[in-house]
């Protein structure tokens, strides 16, 4: 049991106090997120390491969505296998299993319960797709038109679009007619036919009506349906038979009420024909009165895009339920590296902040809240590095605003001067949208991602939502809730007392001092002290398990009679290499060959000044940490891989042999291997926590004292004075 779980009663009580403060201030904060999971017993499989897709991942996704629908007691939701992300080099969009429902509890689907299961139903007629489309045409009272039949796909295509004519909405349909001496032919591929329609063969026939974009869920009253000119509609509903399943592909409509009416017409058609169906295609357009969750694949993980909730107790119930249902399927939120060190899923656990609707988002109502969050995180590197994954730095998935582009701080301060309470959302995006990005200008890869706040060029993404991306997946629900509570408390504090201190110019100190466990934890203590002064008392003991996993102890031993030595993992901002040409185009690898660790020595306070630390034959500098402790940070070449930085002339500097001396009197030391102690690599991941712990023990070996020699002093660096970089050694 982790420390957060052990102290859960106190944490939950503080959550209630923070909630009371948020309610009293009228913040109206809603929080969601994107937690990720892996299969506990299949971590060697490529789909749970680097691949996004996989058969087992898909089946687990189906099961998890089914369990969450039941556990959350969703009111007759719409279940749909939608189209997810589509990245360059991938042959098709990834799947996205979704459940959508109305906030007011009214059923979104009024037919027999839907499923996203791949299980087949009873045998169906060969013309089932045609029967379904013909009946749907009658239910929607569409003009008689011959749909496009695609025998090779066992599919029927019905062009369909909600339009607006004379200020009244209506359904429109049309015939699709192939060009002379040709046939309409779907595009090749393995995706649903709805994504492979031959739209370019239809020509440039203009639709004489505007598409309907209504948003009122219940007042949409369409007039008589319209027969549009042939080939003028470029959207279509597709019904296809896949084995013994009938699947209905929903087109991407922008009118929310039209989408809902189409869904109800499909449900009625299914009931009339007594024909079970499975929905696929596009989800409902985003609307404040519609909620949804999705289960999607990402490289190595299964991601849950969880719906936002508006109070602490709902957040607790939701998070605990999610972890429980995932665990019941054999999913976990923790894994181990080959060398036994604990790590997160690798897929992150982003946190989203917003409101019940874009108009009530606290970030748009009070732009100074956004400034406070950005500024306070910039002042406290522990908030950036203390909860992130192993890959940090300017080229990671969530770089700090001052990483890689230090000149941005000046521009950011100018932008902050323009933020006012009466500023419209588009102006907020114009001021900050280009500044919160990584070194390549990617706005999604930023610690504070504004892609869903109010992007001017993407109206469909104007949700009033801020995404905090520098959060890795915690191993249990209590730790996840502690993270969420930390953010909620900071929001409550900044709402009452905006944080508007000038931004700090950390320079190289950011990647020197603030990569060590000691510096991160000291900085985090100051964060908790600020919150305590604001009236929100966090006990540092609640975070003990988190920091034990974030900075694992590599080994410790008692040497001599009154000295002790401890090694802990430190952070290393891995660089991204230059472009490399391969069969799929170009790619950029990550150089993970360097490691950094913290040496902590404890001894008699009156003799500490005589301490000397020798690492691989070099005397290295150390910094005092209290009266009786010394800390040294060592950076070294842990392994050599093709194409890594710097040149291959620096061989792996392993093992690390550390010896302590009091003056010239040897005290003892240790030997540390970053990988297997025979100098090789482990071939398989640990199969259990016990095996992982044993690998860690094997890689750390106490050493007896040796005789003093005149050890050379390792050259220091003005840029990184607190880091002993063994790559600077000679010989």
List PLM regions with ranges.
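C-terminal accessory/tail domains of diverse enzymes
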Residues: 1-277, 285-300, 307-310, 314-345, ...
């Amino acid at each position: 049991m982790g420390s957060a779980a052990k102290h859960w009663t106190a944490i939950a009580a503080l959550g209630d106090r923070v909630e009371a403060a948020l309610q009293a201030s009228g913040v109206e904060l809603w929080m969601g997120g994107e937690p990720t999971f892996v299969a506990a017993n299949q971590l060697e499989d490529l789909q749970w390491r680097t691949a996004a897709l996989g058969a087992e991942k898909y089946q687990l996704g189906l099961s998890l969505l089914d369990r969450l629908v039941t556990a959350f007691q969703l009111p007759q939701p719409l279940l749909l296998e939608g189209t997810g992300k589509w990245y360059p080099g991938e042959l098709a969009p990834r799947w996205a299993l979704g459940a959508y429902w109305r906030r007011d509890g009214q059923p979104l689907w009024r037919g027999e319960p839907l499923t996203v299961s791949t299980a087949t139903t009873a045998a169906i007629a060969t013309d089932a797709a045609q029967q379904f489309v013909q009946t749907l045409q009658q239910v929607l009272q569409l003009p008689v038109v011959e749909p496009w039949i695609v025998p090779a796909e066992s599919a029927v295509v019905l062009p369909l679009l909600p339009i607006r004519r004379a200020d009244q909405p209506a359904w429109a349909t049309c015939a699709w007619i192939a060009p002379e001496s040709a046939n309409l032919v779907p595009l090749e591929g393995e995706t649903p036919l709805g994504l492979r329609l031959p739209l370019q063969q239809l020509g440039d026939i203009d639709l004489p009506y505007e598409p309907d974009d209504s948003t009122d869920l219940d007042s949409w009253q369409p007039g008589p349906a319209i027969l549009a000119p042939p080939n003028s509609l470029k959207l279509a509903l597709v019904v296809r038979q896949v084995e013994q399943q009938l699947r209905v592909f929903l087109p991407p409509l922008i009118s929310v009420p039209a989408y809902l009416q189409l869904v109800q017409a499909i449900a009625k058609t299914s009931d009339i024909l007594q024909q079970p169906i499975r929905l696929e295609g596009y989800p409902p357009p985003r609307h404040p009165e519609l909620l949804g969750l999705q289960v999607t694949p990402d490289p190595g993980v299964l991601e849950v895009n969880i719906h936002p909730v508006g109070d602490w107790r709902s957040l607790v119930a939701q998070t605990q339920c999610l972890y429980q249902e995932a665990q019941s399927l054999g999913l976990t939120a923790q894994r181990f590296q080959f060398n036994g060190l604990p790590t997160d899923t690798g897929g992150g656990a982003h946190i989203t902040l917003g409101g019940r609707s874009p108009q009530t988002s606290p970030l748009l109502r009070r732009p100074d809240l956004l400034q406070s969050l950005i500024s306070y995180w910039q002042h406290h590197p522990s908030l950036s590095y203390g909860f992130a994954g192993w890959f940090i730095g300017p080229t990671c998935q969530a770089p700090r605003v001052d990483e890689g582009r230090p000149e941005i701080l000046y521009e950011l301060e100018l932008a902050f001067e323009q933020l006012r309470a009466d500023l419209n959302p588009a102006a907020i995006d114009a001021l900050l949208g280009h500044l919160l990005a990584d070194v390549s200008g990617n706005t999604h890869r930023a610690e504070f991602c504004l892609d869903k706040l109010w992007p001017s060029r993407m109206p469909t993404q104007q949700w009033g939502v801020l995404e905090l991306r520098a959060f890795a997946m915690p191993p249990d629900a209590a730790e996840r809730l502690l993270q969420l509570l930390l953010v909620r408390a900071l929001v409550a504090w900044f709402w009452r007392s905006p944080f508007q201190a000038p931004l700090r110019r950390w320079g190289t100190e950011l990647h020197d001092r603030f990569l060590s466990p000691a510096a991160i934890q000291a900085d985090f203590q100051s964060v908790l002290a600020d919150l305590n002064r604001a009236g929100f008392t966090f006990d540092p003991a609640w975070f003990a398990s988190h920091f034990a996993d974030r900075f694992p102890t590599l080994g410790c031993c008692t040497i001599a009679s009154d000295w002790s030595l401890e090694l802990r993992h430190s952070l290393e901002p891995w660089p991204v290499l230059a472009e490399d040409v391969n069969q799929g185009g170009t790619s950029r690898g990550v150089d993970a060959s360097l490691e950094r660790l913290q040496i902590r020595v404890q001894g008699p306070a009156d003799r500490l000044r005589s301490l000397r630390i020798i690492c691989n034959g070099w005397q290295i500098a150390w910094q005092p940490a209290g009266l009786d402790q010394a800390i040294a940070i060592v950076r070294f070449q842990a392994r050599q891989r093709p194409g890594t930085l710097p040149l291959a002339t620096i061989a792996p500097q392993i093992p690390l042999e550390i010896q302590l001396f009091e003056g010239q009197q040897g005290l003892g030391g240790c030997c540390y291997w970053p990988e297997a102690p025979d100098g090789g690599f482990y071939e398989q991941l640990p199969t259990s926590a016990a095996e992982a712990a044993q690998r860690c023990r094997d890689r750390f070996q106490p050493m007896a004292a040796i005789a003093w020699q005149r050890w050379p002093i390792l050259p220091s660096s003005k840029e990184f004075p607190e880091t002993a970089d063994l790559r600077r050694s000679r010989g």
